[in-house]
Amino acid sequence: GAELIDAKGMYVVPGGVEIHCHGGGGGDFMEGTEEAFRTAINAHMKHGTTSIFPTLSSSTVPMIEQAAETCTKMMAEKDSPILGLHLEGHYLNMAMAGGQMPENIKNPDPNEYIPIVENWHCIKRWDAAPELPGAMQFGKYITGKGILASVAHTQAEFEDIRTAYEAGYTHATHFYNAMPGFHKRREYKYEGTVESIYLMDDMTVEVVADGIHVPPTILRLVYKIKGVER
């Protein structure tokens, strides 16, 4: 009774779940338009992705709302591959902005994020730097709404990460990138964000596994410590 598939010499594997993706095929989710969303999603669907979380970099509220409106509409379609919207920012540490747009970066503001969350239920993940003023309140609020709180673009040390984990931050965005490792100030040594996340056994991590953002030796270390499930 098993289904036979003629793979013509190729492999049949489960479809990929893209949890952090800014676009593809010339389409950028930051544009917020249905055309951009479809262009990017179709490009990924042609190469083995079957589910996707469109990702926005640090954005203004109108940009978030436009993308959320498009995302909500497309999620309602039959067999939609979109699982939810991922916001990478804009509550990030300016010193670790990296490729983010600095003009959009700020501290968490409940007068801003509460209406966004209440109005747009398509948002399923929101990244933030936990050391920012208001970040713990933000983490508790969004996790209470079923949104994954993730650590990103941060200078957090151990106590920041420990407190953040207790506040609901259970994931780390592009682990090792835009976050410090072990370091010192004068003669004193401090755990960086990386080591602190390793010490939170149940925290999950995502890695840009291209051998460039994170070298192969470090990829092996992440796998050895966190394992395939985390």
Feature roles, as predicted:
Residues 1-13:
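Histidine-rich, glycine-flanked metal-binding segment
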Residues 10-32:
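Di-metal (Zn2+ and/or Mg2+/Mn2+) metal-binding site signature of metallo-dependent hydrolases
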Residues 22, 38-67, 80-93, 120-131, ...:
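Divalent metal-dependent hydrolysis catalytic cores, especially in the metallo-beta-lactamase
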Residues 27-31, 43, 57-63, 131, ...:
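Active-site loop-to-helix "anion-binding N-cap" substructures in soluble metabolic enzymes
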Residues 33-36, 67-70, 109-111, 186-193:
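Charged helix-capping and loop-helix junction motifs
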Residues 72-75, 139-146, 223:
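Surface-exposed amphipathic alpha-helices with a cationic face
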Residues 87, 94-110, 115-191:
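Divalent metal-binding pocket/active-site signature
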Residues 160-230:
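Active-site-adjacent C-terminal substructures of enzyme catalytic domains
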